[in-house]
Structures are given as structure tokens and as C-alpha cells.
């Protein structure tokens, strides 16, 4: 276990932000009786709840380990961050898949690709052999993200538009939030401690991750749950071509 330094302030901000997001989504969904809407509320509430636990672990040092990289030099690995992403990014993908009415086979592919993306980043951050091997793992992770980009811009966007024009508009909004913010993660990673270059300070790196996480988890969820028409469309009898029927 390592003790966070000045970055602890941002880790606590992340913890509080995720707790507030969890409470907000839970209160919003409390009165919902529609099964499809409940599914959205449960998934969307779980996302910041998991992130809150991860940020609490990092803020208290439980989610951080110190690893030697060169001689006596050590680097702090925030493993709880990757545990968070490994659990929450598939939930975000499931939310998108529900809105789009994606096929089960497609959803399974996306979850596997997503896991490769996250684990590639974790593997790179733990490598001690130098910058080259870290960049290789960064490239693996980034390639997986590009494949996700292909599916979200292609098949899922088409399926969302086929459900209704409004569903297509809301899906595009959610997709753009997700992809736009996710595209910034590998940049922060390669410039920070993950890539081993340390171009940006640890505190700045943590701050950027907190801001990105709040946007992708709470911002995404707020936009989704404000789109009540899409939640209703998902439970419409004519929308049977979704992930529950394939």
C-alpha cells in the first residue's frame, strides 16, 4: 500500500463526486416501476457507485501499490483505477447497447474488446522493461479503442437510427460523449505515469482522470436518464430486435 501525496485532494474530490452522482441517480430511479427503465437506472447508478469505491481506495492508499522501475526508483500504480474501468466501462457499453437495441453477439464482442483496452493499459503501467514495451501495450489498448469506435460509429449507430429518429439522436449524443472523452484517456496515460514519460505531473494526471471520469460516468448518466422518451422506446413492444432477443 502506498500513501498518495498532493494528488490525494483530487482523489477525495473524485470520491465525493461519485458518491453524489450515485445518490442522485438512485433517488431519480426510486419511483420507477417500468422494468426497462429500472434496468437503465440500476446500471447507471452502479457505474458511479463502483467508481466511488475505487476512488476511496485510492485516496486512502488501499488502491495504490509502489513498484520499482529503475534501481531504487519506484512508481505508484493506481490499480484501483483499472479495476474501476474494468467494471464500469462494460456497464457504459451495455447502456449504449440497450439504447441502440444491439445484438447479443455484438455486445459480447464489445465487452471483450473493452477488456483488452483496459488490461492493455494496466499491463503497460506495470512494465519495468522501459518505455518501448509500455508504448507497445499502449498501442494495443489504443487499437482496441479504435475497434470500439468502429462499432459505435457503425453498427450501433445504424441500429439506434432504425428504432426511431429520436433514439438515433439521443444515442449519437451519448456515443459522442463516450468516444470524445474516452479518446482523451490514452493521451493522459501516455503523457503521465502510465506511459513512464512523466511529461505531466502526477497531481495533474489525477486531476485530468477525475474530470474525465466524472464526465463519462455522471455526465453520461445524466444525459441518458434525462432522455425519458428513449427509455420508454426501449420498452415499446415493437422494439424487439434488442440484446434480449438475440
Curated annotation (Swiss-Prot):
Matching Gene3D superfamilies, A to Z? Rhodopsin 7-helix transmembrane proteins
Q: Name one GO cellular component term.
A: plasma membrane
The record ties this protein, via PANTHER family, to:
BACTERIORHODOPSIN _OPSIN, NOPA (EUROFUNG), PTHR28286
This protein's membrane topology, according to the annotation, is:
Multi-pass membrane protein
Please tell me the species this chain comes from.
Haloquadratum walsbyi (strain DSM 16790 / HBSQ001)
Q: Name one GO molecular function term.
A: photoreceptor activity
Key word Nucleotide-binding present: no
Intracellular or extracellular location(s) = Cell membrane
UniProt GO BP: phototransduction
Q: Which residues carry this modification: N6-(retinylidene)lysine?
A: 217
* Native organism taxonomy: Archaea, Methanobacteriati, Methanobacteriota, Stenosarchaea group, Halobacteria
Kindly provide the name given to this protein in its UniProt entry.
Bacteriorhodopsin-II-like protein
Amino acid at each position: 500500500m502506498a500513501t498518495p501525496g498532493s494528488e490525494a485532494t483530487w482523489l477525495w474530490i473524485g470520491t465525493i463526486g461519485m458518491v453524489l452522482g450515485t445518490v442522485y441517480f438512485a433517488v431519480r430511479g426510486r419511483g420507477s416501476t417500468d422494468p426497462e427503465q429500472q434496468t437503465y437506472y440500476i446500471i447507471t447508478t452502479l457505474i458511479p457507485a463502483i467508481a466511488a469505491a475505487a476512488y476511496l481506495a485510492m485516496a486512502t492508499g488501499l488502491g495504490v501499490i509502489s513498484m520499482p522501475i529503475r534501481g531504487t526508483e519506484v512508481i505508484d500504480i493506481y490499480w484501483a483505477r483499472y479495476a474501476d474501468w474494468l467494471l464500469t466501462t462494460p456497464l457504459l457499453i451495455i447502456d449504449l447497447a440497450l439504447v441502440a437495441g444491439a445484438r447479443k453477439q455484438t455486445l459480447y464482442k464489445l465487452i471483450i474488446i473493452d477488456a483488452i483496452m483496459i488490461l492493455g493499459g494496466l499491463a503497460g503501467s506495470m512494465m519495468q522493461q522501459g518505455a518501448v514495451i509500455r508504448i507497445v501495450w499502449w498501442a494495443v489498448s489504443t487499437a482496441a479503442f479504435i475497434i470500439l469506435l468502429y462499432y459505435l460509429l457503425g453498427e450501433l449507430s445504424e441500429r439506434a437510427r432504425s428504432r426511431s429518429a429520436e433514439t438515433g439522436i439521443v444515442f449519437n449524443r451519448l456515443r459522442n460523449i463516450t468516444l470524445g472523452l474516452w479518446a482523451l484517456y490514452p493521451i493522459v496515460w501516455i503523457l503521465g505515469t502510465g506511459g513512464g514519460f512523466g511529461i505531466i505531473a502526477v497531481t495533474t494526471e489525477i486531476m485530468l482522470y477525475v474530470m474525465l471520469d466524472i464526465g463519462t460516468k455522471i455526465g453520461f448518466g445524466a444525459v441518458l436518464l434525462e432522455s425519458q422518451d428513449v427509455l420508454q422506446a426501449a420498452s415499446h413492444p415493437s422494439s424487439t430486435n434488442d440484446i434480449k432477443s438475440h
